[in-house]
Amino acid sequence: MAQYHQQHEMKQTMAETQYVTAPPPMGYPVMMKDSPQTVQPPHEGQSKGSGGFLRGCLAAMCCCCVLDCVF
């Protein structure tokens, strides 16, 4: 009977403890509760139809042709 009371008390104290986590690595962005939310500017990328994919394919084909002629 004494063993039952010891196990019951141990389970109760384990449930009441707070869990602690490790701090994030250095340089990792951390959001503070008191700091205001920062608004990031919109991403300025290339517009559609700029031909990036087509230019890359043509450059690859030219490289293949040059390598074919050389070897």
UniProtKB/Swiss-Prot annotation:
Expression by tissue: Mostly expressed in leaves and flowers and, to a lower extent, in stems, siliques, shoots and roots.
Keyword list, A-Z: Cell membrane, Cytoplasm, Membrane, Mitochondrion, Transmembrane, Transmembrane helix
A cellular component annotation (GO) from this entry: cytoplasm
Inducing stimuli: Induced by salt, cold and drought.
GO biological process: negative regulation of response to salt stress; regulation of reactive oxygen species biosynthetic process; response to salt stress; sodium ion homeostasis
Subcellular location: Cell membrane; Cytoplasm; Mitochondrion
Effect of loss of the gene: Increased tolerance to high salinity with reduced reactive oxygen species (ROS) levels and associated with an over-activation of nuclear salt stress-responsive genes.
Transmembrane segments: 48-64
A Pfam family matched in the record: CYSTM
Region of interest: Disordered: 30-49
Keyword S-adenosyl-L-methionine part of the UniProt annotation: no
Membrane topology note: Single-pass membrane protein
Subunit composition and interactions: Heterodimers. Interacts with CYSTM7 and WIH1/CYSTM13.
Function: Negatively regulates salt stress responses and Na(+) homeostasis. Prevents Na(+) efflux, disturbs reactive oxygen species (ROS) homeostasis, and represses the expression of nuclear salt stress-responsive genes. Involved in resistance to abiotic stress.
Family: Belongs to the CYSTM1 family.
Protein name: Protein CYSTEINE-RICH TRANSMEMBRANE MODULE 3
Species assigned in the record: Arabidopsis thaliana
Chain's gene name: CYSTM3
